[in-house]
């Protein structure tokens, strides 16, 4: 209300979970738009944020949408961004080009794929390398269970004709440090080789 903004937006925080059980939150940024990661919030709250944003823009209120109370989070969700790029053993990220000859995303209970790939697609390296987002939902609030489900979904994603970061993502999702949340913001840099 103080800034006169009446729509959906994104507030980002970094959480530092210390060994003594305390958590420290650091504010990163606020965006007057949805971020690409909004799908995780949709899965754990059951609220279609894009539809809600459109309805608010058309003049509806949160009361009209039945959203006067903060939705209860349920379960656990993870999103994996499938990029048309490879990650070298030294951590260098390289763009991938070529004609997409096969695009067969995973599906099933608790698996959602948002993407735009199709056989015959010729991507340009002049734009963002994002090809798809695989979002998995676990009804149980278990990070490890959701991680394993995400890894399984990525193992079923069939993409041919260009390289993606799926092998890297699968490696991260299977890593014990990752599964036990024993990571920091430097973890990928320190473990890429």
Residue ranges of predicted features:
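ATP-dependent carboxylate activation and anion-phosphoryl transfer catalytic cores
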Residues: 1-193
């Amino acid at each position: 209300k103080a800034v006169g903004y009446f729509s959906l937006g994104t507030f980002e925080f970094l959480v530092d979970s210390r060994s003594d059980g305390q958590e420290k939150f650091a504010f990163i940024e606020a965006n007057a738009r949805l971020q690409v990661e909004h799908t995780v919030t949709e899965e754990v709250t059951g609220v279609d944020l894009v539809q809600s944003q459109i309805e608010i823009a058309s003049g509806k209120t949160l009361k009209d949408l039945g959203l006067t109370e903060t939705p209860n989070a349920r379960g656990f969700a993870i999103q994996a961004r499938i990029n048309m790029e490879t990650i070298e053993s030294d951590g260098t990220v390289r763009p991938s080009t070529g004609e997409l000859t096969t695009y067969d995303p995973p599906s099933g209970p608790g698996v959602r794929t948002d993407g735009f790939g199709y056989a015959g697609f010729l991507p340009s390296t002049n734009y963002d390398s994002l090809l798809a987002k695989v979002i998995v939902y676990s009804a149980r609030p278990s990070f490890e269970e959701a991680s394993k489900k995400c890894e399984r979904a990525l193992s079923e994603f069939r993409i041919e004709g260009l390289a993606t970061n799926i092998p890297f993502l699968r490696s991260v999702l299977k890593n014990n440090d990752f599964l036990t949340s024993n990571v920091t913001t430097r973890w990928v840099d320190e473990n890429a080789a």
